[in-house]
Amino acid sequence: MFFSNIDKSKYNIYIHYKYDERLEFLEEYKVSKNIPTKYADISIVKAQNFMLLEALKDKNNTHFIFLSGSCIPLKPFEYIYNNLEERYSYFHIANPEDCLPDCINALTYIDMKYLNKASQWCILNRKHSELLVNNTEYLIWFKNSYAADELCYITYLSYTYGDNLHEEIKATSYNSPPEVATTFANWEGMDYKYATDRELKNYIHITQAELLHLLKSPCFLGRKFKPIAAQSINKDFYLDYVVKNVKGKLFY
């Protein structure tokens, strides 16, 4: 539904699957090879890299948005498409000290000043995607690190651009409300009006008030939403705005 009536020249979809089971609606978008992955393991980065390699074959692809199967859109396609700037990648960044002790071994290869941690659910531009698939030293740096998917890309960009990193990326902070990130997630202890008290919230239901709040917030996407949550998401105001992109729709 999200891509209904959208010009197909404006997007491509690439799906890396954990299990090779037929997808009812998206089977044609599965990538040609499966990279076996484990939770919080460097193998996830290898799978992401393979998707990037596939996506880079299309010269018209300017940005690469990583999503999980539990993501939902919180803005219309055209809004997201028009608000991505070609020169930037987008990251939701943690405090650098949060890298330790998970990536202590990386200090064998690089200086502490380059270490960074960010949400896996970043948006890479073409320039940075090409850099990351053509220079994969970070796979060695973080091969034994927990949650390497949160370390590799942002650290390598920090290592490459140094003090000029801020000119290459648009970053939001873990210390900010989570709805300012490009992909929202509700973690325990965050500065959020509807904060969970149980680590990462897996939504089986969302109140209308919270859904409206997220639609009005800067975030493009949100996670983690279980399939059953669709019952509380598929409301007219959500579908009119996010799917139909009704101009001037008043849901505020």
Predicted regions mapped to residue ranges:
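ER/Golgi luminal nucleotide-sugar-dependent glycosyltransferases, focusing on the catalytic module
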Residues: 1-252
